[in-house]
Amino acid sequence: KKTIEEDVEFVCELKFDGVSISLTYENGLFVKAVTRGDGTQGDDVTTNIKTIRNIPLRLKGDYPDFFEMRGEVIMPHSSFNSINAEREDLGLQPFANPRNAAAGTIKLQDSKEVAKRKLDQYCYFMMMDDDKMIFNTHYESLAAAKQWGFNVSNFMAICKNVEDIEDFINYWDEKRKELPFDIDGIVIKVNDFKQREILGFTAKSPRWAIAYKFKAEEAHTQLLSVDFQVGRHGTITPVAN
């Protein structure tokens, strides 16, 4: 087993509650967008992703010839509320939450409808071959990505120890209610790329990153009535009002 015989610096970031996406760029041009899917194969959603205004179709500055940018497609609260109000007016079932709405939207056949729903996207990880990586740290790579035109969250911090990490988590556990989009936790990553190489991966995930999930928000509600709907095959489903 390998160990890191030096101090470790971490980057703490918001864990966006949306749809994971991989963006491929060649010679500064956006060429493909694929959902995460089962981890090895996802859906090609390039045409729909092109409608998201904060995803650059052409990069600026000094960028690598070929790389992938991982990110999250989200639906802001303002868009979510507007879409659900419109669906209710049309007698359609409203979306349960912004994540489901974003997931359904990027798979629509009509790109014009996707554009009208005003999705956002945040980038959080740059992927390229190790021998072509031009940065020493994760934080440096995201700072460069922002210069090239990517939308990178400003809500991240370099943490030197456990106390710094706990402070970041506690702060955003309180402040998340004020954000214009949903988050469901904090992602903690080792900042230095060489240290990441030493730590490596398990069969399912990197050893240099971990997600802290917030507790689900709780609220009181009142049950007014229960309707019973009968399906085509005679299945009876209770529906609470």
Model-derived segments and their meaning:
Residues K1-N241:
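RNA/tRNA-interacting regions in translation and RNA-turnover enzymes
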